[in-house]
Amino acid sequence: MEINGVEIEDTFAEAFEAKMARVLITAASHKWAMIAVKEATGFGTSVIMCPAEAGIDCGYVPPEETPDGRPGVTIMIGHNDEDELKEQLLDRIGQCVMTAPTASAFDAMPEAEKEDEDRVGYKLSFFGDGYQEEDELDGRKVWKIPVVEGEFIVEDSFGITTGVAGGNFYIMAESQPAGLQAAEAAVDAIKGVEGAYAPFPGGIVASASKVGSKQYDFLPASTNDAYCPTVEDNELPEGVKCVYEIVINGLNEEAVKEAMRVGIEAACQQPGVVKISAGNFGGKLGQYEIHLHDLF
């Protein structure tokens, strides 16, 4: 299969079940919502060494669609362990959103997806030291926590669902600039898919990994040498000088598949892309096999 002359390898991405939360962060302006978002999604690329996998889902939610009538941004936070995810929700909303000027936090999990919930707002309300108040806003139970700025408003409970983590594809290009241009185009396309996010820096992985190590038994992961252009015995097609990986997490398999589809299509429209592939473990580890050819 080819798209715009770019080979699409007959392979699949192996993805996993993961617990997901979805948070709407609003503020007095989109600028301040984004500042809170960047803090709340920080150090959230991969659970290989990060405490969660976090990123932006919807980069702009207009005031008419938010509970408090202010501009907002929707983020997603994922972890393979539900208790760890609940802890991350508490930590990230408490330390990164409550501390951000004018920011508020609301549950953004669709009711149809919600499997469980955690009373993050209730837990955070104790920061108010007895001065906190329970209230209702736009039909939602919220807590008003007094802070030196005024009040921090946070929804009482946040929904949790079983989503999908680790959807992926590789962009193999004839040069680093060409690869980066294609990867940026892919991420821009993925931003338009609701319920999916790319947790790595700018949505792009520059140092794709493999499980374990050939040389060091203490490593949980090491460089994917088969795709490293500077390694002499790599497995790259002729002419490939750079590889970027795009990793996608989502609320469900459909969102991840759609994000992969539009991302691959966008990448293939850019010059200098040689091949699109994907990472898997032979179907031995993940619950999902997303075959590239089936996306089109």
From Swiss-Prot:
As one GO molecular function, the record gives: formylmethanofuran-tetrahydromethanopterin N-formyltransferase activity
Q: Name one GO biological process term.
A: one-carbon metabolic process
Q: Which GO terms describe its cellular component?
A: cytoplasm
Q: Which reaction does it catalyse?
A: N-formylmethanofuran + 5,6,7,8-tetrahydromethanopterin + H(+) = N(5)-formyl-5,6,7,8-tetrahydromethanopterin + methanofuran
What are the thermal characteristics recorded for this entry? Optimum temperature is 90 degrees Celsius.
* Cell compartment(s), UniProt: Cytoplasm
Q: How is its activity regulated?
A: Requires high salt concentrations for activity and thermostability; 1.5-1.8 M KH(2)PO(4) stimulates activity while stabilizing the enzyme.
- Pathway connected to this protein: One-carbon metabolism; methanogenesis from CO(2); 5,10-methenyl-5,6,7,8-tetrahydromethanopterin from CO(2): step 2/3
What is the top EC class of this enzyme, as a single word?
transferase
Quaternary structure and partners = Homotetramer composed of two dimers. Dimerization is sufficient for enzyme activity, but tetramerization is required for high thermostability.
Q: What is this protein called?
A: Formylmethanofuran--tetrahydromethanopterin formyltransferase
Species in which this protein is naturally found:
Methanopyrus kandleri (strain AV19 / DSM 6324 / JCM 9639 / NBRC 100938)
Lineage of source species? Archaea, Methanobacteriati, Methanobacteriota, Methanomada group, Methanopyri
